Each structure stands twice: as C-alpha cells, then as structure tokens.
C-alpha cells in the first residue's frame, strides 16, 4: 500500500490490522497504525543505540551524532541560544516526519503523511505549540503580535494577523500531504509502466523529495517558534 493506493510490489504487510469494525461499519485507520509503526521503529532504534553508546563512536552512533549536531547547530545559528531548548522537539519533528515519509518507499507499508489527517494533526500541534510558547514568554503582551505597533491599526491588523496565523496550519498540512501523496501516485505509475528493476533508480529522486518535505516542515516550525519568541511591537 502507498498512501491508500495499491502498492506496486506487495499488498499491505499488516493486512486487516489497519481497520476496525464499529457497529457494522468498517473504519480504516491506516495513517494512525503506520504512525505507530514508525514511532515503534524509531523508539527501537533509539533504545538499541542508547545501549551501545561508547566514548569512541562508530557506525550508526557516529552517523546519528553527526546528524543531531548538525540539526542543533543549525537551530542555534538561526534562533540563537534561546533555540537550544527546542532542539529535541524540532529534531524529533524532522526525524518523525522523515521516517513517516520513508515508509511509503517500503513495499507493503503506507506513508502516514500521504493522509491529510496526519498532516493536519501535525500542523495543528505546531500552531498551538508556538502560540503557547509566545504566551508563556510574553504573557498578555503576546497579543501585540496580532495588533501591530499602533492602536489605530488594530481594526486592520488584528483580522489580518489572525487569518495569517490560521493559514499556517493549512499551508503546512496541504504542502506535506500534497507532495507526499503526489509522489506515491507517481511511484505507482512508474511501477505499472516499467519493470521493477528499471524503476529502482527513481527511488533516489523520491528519497530527495521526502527529505526536502520533512526539512521544509521542520524549517517553518522553527521560524514560527522564533517569531513567537521575538519581542512584540508596542
């Protein structure tokens, strides 16, 4: 399966485990099930790496340490020292979305991000989180992010800012869903039109696209948090 589409190589690996029957109605929850599968895989990898930590890193430890250091340096260079406390969250968002994106490349699995429900939930979490960060940091003064520098501009600025903030989860969710879903459809078409071995090189292109979509979501989340931490105009 791939985003609800028949997978070109295998049927769903966990056929029958991604749906339940309630009152005679079949309710599918592939996106939830495969999100849990992704979390389980990431937790398992983290647990194995934690047990094998050494003072002289090698192999996977070296790779993951380099990746985390790169992400941390990027966040701190963009947000300043205030951003260091958000490294676990932002790095987790990137790795989690990247992992869910990659599941669409594995025969028999779905990419949860090819389902709009998943991306909407992620985007709504970002909306609530960065506004909560702003409220905690600036208390009631955070409202000035929405009203502008002058009280005379409130009737104009407030509705514009509200619409602007509400459009962020819409943009985040539709961008991620549309790109991943589109890639899943194109991948199915490639496998239909050509032999399996002949289409394997296209996986590199899909891998790049899925990486970029996770990075874009991560970047925008970081900038939204950074904006909430900035001093509001009075």
Swiss-Prot record:
Pfam families: ATP-synt_A. GO terms for biological process: proton motive force-driven plasma membrane ATP synthesis. SUPFAM superfamilies: F1F0 ATP synthase subunit A (SSF81336). The keyword Signal does not apply. CDD domains: ATP-synt_Fo_a_6. GO terms for molecular function: proton-transporting ATP synthase activity, rotational mechanism. F-type ATPases have 2 components, CF(1) - the catalytic core - and CF(0) - the membrane proton channel. CF(1) has five subunits: alpha(3), beta(3), gamma(1), delta(1), epsilon(1). CF(0) has three main subunits: a(1), b(2) and c(9-12). The alpha and beta chains form an alternating ring which encloses part of the gamma chain. CF(1) is attached to CF(0) by a central stalk formed by the gamma and epsilon chains, while a peripheral stalk is formed by the delta and b chains. Belongs to the ATPase A chain family. Key component of the proton channel; it plays a direct role in the translocation of protons across the membrane. HAMAP family: ATP_synth_a_bact (MF_01393). This is ATP synthase subunit a. It comes from Desulfovibrio desulfuricans (strain ATCC 27774 / DSM 6949 / MB).
